[in-house]
Amino acid sequence: PLRLVGSEMCIRDRIYCWRGGQRSSSFATILSEIGWRPSLVDGGYKNYRNDVTQLLHKTKPPYQFILISGHTGTAKTEIVNILNEFSLQTIDLEGLANHRGSVFGATATKQSSQKLFESRLFTRLQSLDPRKPIILESESNKIGQLAIPSMIWNIMKLSPRIEVNAPLNERAKYLTTTYADLILSLIHI
């Protein structure tokens, strides 16, 4: 049986099937009958993936990036996330890829698939104003096993950078705090 918990019955995610046909629209009808407000992906997943591929791999997106760069341990990801809290446009590529991005690598949970990473990046880009710069951390063309999509990578290579510097001892302190889980796992080996 279907159970609804909470007072607000609303689906904010979009519903799709392969081509956007009767399966997704039938399910959306059922959900709307029980009080939810679903939206459908026009043309289904096939059309959605085409939009993702077009933006990330085939046409030059209309975005301007500013990259935060620096050595490991200079809190670049943290800086990007703090700037986001101040309502600046940011993208946390490592967060979207579920990876630390540095030499310390993987998180405790499995890394996303390439398609999921691209979908997350596409969704994030669609939520931002292309007329304003977007701040993101400088990365290599891969984050763990995932490749930064070619058009995004091409923009990143030409983007202005803000270099973050910190003394080695401060970086070491930051790393031992931020990556404490890795230190503990090494102790248990």
Q: What do the predicted segments below correspond to?
A:
Residues W36-N50, D92-A97:
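A short glycine-rich beta-strand->turn/loop micro-motif centered on a GG-aromatic cluster
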Residues E8, R12-V41:
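Catalytic cysteine-centered active loop of the rhodanese-like fold, especially the PTP/DSP P-loop
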Residues I91, G95-P149:
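Conserved nucleotide-sensing/catalytic segment adjacent to the nucleotide-binding pocket
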Residues L56-Y63:
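Phosphate-binding P-loop
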Residues M156-L175:
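Conserved phosphate-donor/acceptor-positioning beta-strand/loop module used by diverse small-molecule
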Residues P1-G6, I11, I187-H188:
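Single conserved hydrophobic/aromatic residue that forms the stacking wall/gate
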Residues L67-N84:
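Glycine-rich phosphate-binding P-loop
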